[in-house]
């Protein structure tokens, strides 16, 4: 089983190499530096699904909020 969490992109750290693209992502106020190499089209304000430090997809705000509610109900 793997756990991937939604977070909101709060800043991008530009890099000329898209494989090294990183950004700051907020998880309920906890800010982490995350690799955005798999989602190079991401923008500040977007929600991403993050697994082991890598954003693996972009999701809309509604889907992110639903996931956060589900996780809270499970006590995660």
From Swiss-Prot:
GO molecular function, one term: carbon dioxide binding
Pathways per UniProt: Protein modification; [NiFe] hydrogenase maturation
Listed GO biological process terms: protein maturation
Matches recorded under SUPFAM superfamilies: HupF/HypC-like
Domain of life: Bacteria
Record-linked Pfam families: HupF_HypC
Matches recorded under InterPro entries: Hydgase_assmbl_chp_CS, Hydrogenase_HupF/HypC
Protein task: Involved in the maturation of [NiFe] hydrogenases. Involved in the biosynthesis of the Fe(CN)(2)CO cofactor.
UniProt record similarity statement: Belongs to the HupF/HypC family.
NCBIfam families linked: hypC_hupF (TIGR00074)
Protein name: Hydrogenase maturation factor HypC
Gene behind this protein: hypC
